Amino acid sequence: MKSKVVTREEALSRIHDGQTIMFGDWHGEFAADEIIDGMLEKGIKDIVSAGMADQGVGKLIKDHRVKSLITTHIGLNPIAKDQMFAGELAIEFSPQGTFAERIRCGGAGLGGCLTPTGLGTEVEEGKQKLT
């Protein structure tokens, strides 16, 4: 069986500009700081991710390395809010349950998930609607 544990260098060799990356980061407490710092060192940019302002993934946002976020909230990251309102950062908000299901589907190799959450509200705007 192939090991799921890799070195910092192996992990960084698999990360490139423009990728969508999911980080487990709760208030900066569980961030992959070695990987995030390595991404800053390598100059990786245009990442899709979130976090707090000066911790974890937030360091990538602060350095303008993130082009868009798929998140449940950005309330703890004033830099992300400022970039969003300045048109520098695209943000897709997703309800927590839908967010978790999207993660599950991605991990299972599925193309996506269908949910009625947000139909008939502002959340529906710009989204594909299947009937």
Regions found by a protein language model. Name each.
Residues 1-131:
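Conserved alpha/beta enzyme-core scaffold
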